[in-house]
């Protein structure tokens, strides 16, 4: 059912994928239209493409408000593994998306534990302070 949407999100046309991600994100804040897509987004968390990982993580977070079946309960541990991604942009974008998730789901303990386990030493000196700042900002909301 969502095969075409997944193709666009994961396709080689990154501009189209990014625009489509923004469109799905906006729509996800207004309706549960893409909630059923959660199960299909999950495997994308392991994509080789960093942007695909970010898009899937973020869209899954945006479904938290509609998670009447508690689908995210079975995915949250794998989602939080992205907070230790090798790409600092993935870590930063995932931390950003967690703000939305934590409004609707009580994963505070798991999220805080994952934030505390981020190894900032593996990132360049230019990125580590930015990630630390993101971590501190999210912790203030927990």
Which role fits each region the language model picked out?
Residues 4-6, 40-42, 72, 78-80, ...:
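Buried hydrophobic core positions in alpha-solenoid tandem helical repeats
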Residues 1-25:
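N-terminal "cap/leader" segments of large eukaryotic alpha-helical scaffolds
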Residues 2, 112-142:
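Eukaryotic acidic, Ser/Thr-rich intrinsically disordered low-complexity regions
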Residues 45-85:
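Helix-adjacent hinge/juxtasegments
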Residues 22-23, 58-62, 96-100, 133-137:
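Residue-level signature of alpha-solenoid helical repeat scaffolds
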Residues 26-36, 64-72, 101-112, 141:
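Flexible loop/turn segments at the boundaries of HEAT repeats in alpha-solenoid HEAT proteins
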Residues 12-14, 48-50, 86-88, 123-124, ...:
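Short inter-helical turns and helix N-cap capping residues of alpha-solenoid HEAT/ARM repeat scaffolds
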């Amino acid at each position: 059912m969502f095969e075409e949407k997944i193709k666009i999100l994961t396709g080689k046309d990154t501009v189209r994928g990014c625009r489509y991600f923004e469109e799905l994100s906006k729509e996800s804040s207004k309706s549960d239209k893409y909630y059923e897509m959660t199960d299909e987004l999950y495997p994308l968390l392991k994509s080789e493409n960093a942007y695909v990982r970010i898009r899937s993580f973020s869209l899954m977070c945006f479904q938290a408000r509609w998670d009447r079946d508690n689908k995210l309960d079975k995915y949250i541990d794998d989602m939080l593994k992205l907070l230790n991604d090798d790409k600092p942009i993935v870590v930063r974008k995932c931390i950003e998306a967690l703000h939305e998730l934590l409004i609707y789901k009580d994963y505070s303990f798991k999220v805080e534990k994952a934030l505390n386990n981020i190894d900032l030493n593996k990132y360049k000196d230019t990125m580590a302070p930015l990630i630390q700042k993101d971590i501190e900002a999210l912790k203030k909301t927990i």
